[in-house]
Amino acid sequence: MSEEDKSKKLEELLKLLKVHDGDLSKFTSQQRKDMNEYKFWKTQPVTKFDEVIKKEGPIDSSKRPEDIPDTPLPLLGDFEWCTVDVNDEKQLEDVYVLLNENYVEDKDSTFRFNYSRDFLNWGLKPPGWKEEWQVGVRVKETKRLVGFISAIPTNLQVRGNDVRSVEINFLCVHKKLRSKRLAPILIKEVTRRVNKYDIWQALHTGGVVLPSPVSSCRYAHRPLNWSKLYDVEFTALPANATKTQMIAKYTLPKTPISNIKLMEERHVDEAFELFNKYQQRFELRPNFDKEEFRHWILTREDVVYSYIIENDEGKVTDFVSFYSLPFTIINNPLYKDLGIGYMFYYASDADFGYDRFSAEGTERLRKRLNLLINDACILARNLKMDVFNALTSQDNALFLEDLKFGPGDGFLNFYLFNYRCFPITGGIKEDQTFDVEKRSNVGVVLL
């Protein structure tokens, strides 16, 4: 089967997954058969597409750290394993170059993620991070980094159950080596290293369908600088509309509407308490301690921005955060980059004291989130971001349409490694539109 045919099948399966709202039993036998192409994942402790889940929990709990080999799998003769010391500027630079030249880009190769060194320091080194979980493959002769994968520690709550795990991210193989099947070997090696620490579960996300998503969310985009987005062909001019009309449609006030202000260290205790209480509603969520919350949320210039709203008594009632991950624009004479803001974590006390899905509680939260996220969009625009991205996770469905977020073409699938879990709502209906009624039970956000 050609790569093009495989891509088409993946696209078909992705659409089917959305239509069936994560109910994998609705796949036809032929569609399930197509999953046999995933030779690697068939050998891993993951939920199969045709598996009937009767009980949530670990799939394989028989192993112990002493059962795990002390040495990695052998590589082809031209390559060697390495542990990437991201505290070393030269080695961090190797990761930076590999990601920025070979990581995810759009199908037309027009846009590519541009991870800054500061962003990588933030994303790769949360509290408890381990150097040996930053795994690389180098060319023996030149020492050039051609493969990378990262694991960082995280404690998850999955429907009230504590799951000690890692987040897997930044899996990247040099474009010219994609046929060498380095990706499965990188996954096996980081799994081996994590298992030696007696950790057996992992959370990862991706745009392609693998066995077997626990949830799927849709991307949504809110233009902040429509004119630039049009110029770089990130967006198109709708039929029966003019550029002037589109610019006017997406124009935001010059300054925030509320008394929102930058979160400071002195706000952390209250914001952390608010965050924990708000996150209780979600079925898949992080269980941060205060140091982790501080690391992920406090503002770092050009990386992550966080803001709070206080009531008249000075109590923190809301906070919102977003991170900056620009695109490099390839072969464009006008612009070299596109500023992108990504919705991160937020919390509000607007519906505390109400049932989450009650009419009154829902309306109170909808109004508050519309104010909070609209101000976040204004702040992002003032930071020279050109578009604001959000998933349909958390309670985002309550504000996406109101604030002129348009549904994107992309979907993000959430996977739990070595853990069975009933499907979790992702904030989209069967027709793939925003599900304002059920919303999402995914509270965790991965970079």
Swiss-Prot record:
Q: Name one GO cellular component term.
A: cytoplasm
Task: Tell me the Pfam families matching this sequence.
Answer: NMT, NMT_C
- Compartments, record wording: Cytoplasm
First-tier enzyme category under EC = transferase
Instruction: Give me the reactions it catalyses.
Output: N-terminal glycyl-[protein] + tetradecanoyl-CoA = N-tetradecanoylglycyl-[protein] + CoA + H(+)
For this protein, the Enzyme Commission number is 2.3.1.97
The active site is formed by L447
Q: Which residues bind tetradecanoyl-CoA?
A: Y38, K39, F40, W41, L171, C172, V173, S179, K180, R181, L182, A183
- Could you tell me which InterPro entries the record lists for this protein? Acyl_CoA_acyltransferase, NMT, NMT_C, NMT_CS, NMT_N
Q: Annotated Gene Ontology MF terms?
A: glycylpeptide N-tetradecanoyltransferase activity
What keywords is this UniProt entry annotated with? Acyltransferase, Cytoplasm, Transferase
Q: Which PANTHER family match?
A: GLYCYLPEPTIDE N-TETRADECANOYLTRANSFERASE (PTHR11377:SF5), N-MYRISTOYL TRANSFERASE (PTHR11377)
Described by its record, this protein's role is as follows: Adds a myristoyl group to the N-terminal glycine residue of certain cellular proteins.
* Family note: Belongs to the NMT family.
Q: How does it assemble?
A: Monomer.
Protein name per the record = Glycylpeptide N-tetradecanoyltransferase
